Curated annotation (Swiss-Prot):
Short motif (NPG): ranges: 201-203
Disulfide bonds: none
Any matching Pfam family: MIP
Protein family per UniProt: Belongs to the MIP/aquaporin (TC 1.A.8) family.
Cytoplasmic-side positions: 1-11, 61-83, 155-175, 239-242
Organism of this sequence: Enterocytozoon bieneusi (strain H348)
Ranges of the Extracellular topological domain: 33-39, 105-133, 197-217
Name of this protein: Aquaporin
Domain-related comment: Aquaporins contain two tandem repeats each containing three membrane-spanning domains and a pore-forming loop with the signature motif Asn-Pro-Ala (NPA).
Functional summary from the UniProt entry: Water channel required to facilitate the transport of water across membranes. Involved in osmotolerance.
A GO cellular component annotation in the UniProt record: plasma membrane
Superkingdom to which the source organism belongs: Eukaryota
């Protein structure tokens, strides 16, 4: 194995591990709150998403893209910010990571396989939530997340001559990206506790759906998250001239 191939394998493994840890953290928080009928479920999940994402981005950003979200990675591919083949590899690694995360929850919690999958599956909170409600909730949350991820991390530096502030030295905000993105993930998790549940990550939806065989609203989640993420990326890259 040559050095280049080894480096790519390390990047993909790191992204898989990163996604697995994030998925396990989120699924565990969901299981702990749903199984106990906790009245502070949205707070618990929101804080878990926030803190885990901050630590994981800081930890893995030197090894991989540390997206642990196919919506972000696909948006980076479509805007030319990430090599196509490597990006596809990252997406596959993320999906494998989330599948492993779902299996880890099964062996760590005493609810049995099917019940565990039922608890962690992404689903509309009640029958009162329409398909339109579900779609636009996930669309908007994904839009916000990907836009901010591009603004502070993926595409944080304007190209020379394109900035609106000609002659003014640009500030590199990428060093604050893990903190900013983590806080964003945290507050977004609070916004959909009565509608879609707040997934805004196709990987989070993918794991339990594939392993549990429950594809109710699966397509709606995936399409809304990917399209919302793409819009956020396109606006940041092309309309803001960055």
């Amino acid at each position: 194995m040559n050095t280049s191939t080894k480096l790519i394998c390390q990047k993909l493994f790191a992204e898989m591990l990163c996604s697995c840890i994030f998925g396990f953290a989120v699924y565990s928080a969901i299981l702990n709150t749903k199984a106990s009928n906790s009245s502070i479920s949205s707070t618990t999940v929101g804080l878990t998403v926030c803190f885990s994402s901050i630590s994981l981005i800081y930890t893995f950003c030197d090894h991989s893209v540390a997206h642990f979200n196919p919506a972000i990675t696909i948006a980076a591919i479509c805007t030319g910010k990430l090599d196509i083949l490597l990006g596809i590899g990252y997406v596959i690694a993320q999906l494998i990571g989330f599948i492993l995360a779902t299996l880890l929850t099964v062996v760590c919690f005493p609810y049995g396989y099917l019940k565990t999958m039922e608890f962690i599956a992404s689903a509309r909170i009640s029958d009162d939530i329409s398909t339109v409600n579900l779609f636009f909730t996930e669309f908007i949350l994904s839009f916000i997340l990907v836009f901010i991820a591009f603004e502070v991390g993926i595409n944080a530096i304007r190209e020379p001559g394109v900035t609106l502030f000609v002659g003014i030295k640009q500030i590199d905000r990428s060093k604050f990206a893990p903190l900013t993105i983590g806080i964003t993930l945290g507050f977004l998790a609070f916004l959909a506790s009565t509608t879609s549940g707040g997934a805004f990550n196709p990987g989070i939806v993918w794991g339990p759906a594939i392993m549990g065989g429950n594809f109710d609203d699966f397509v709606i989640y995936i399409i809304s998250e990917l399209s919302g993420g793409l819009l956020g990326a396109f606006i940041q890259v092309f309309l803001l001239f960055k």
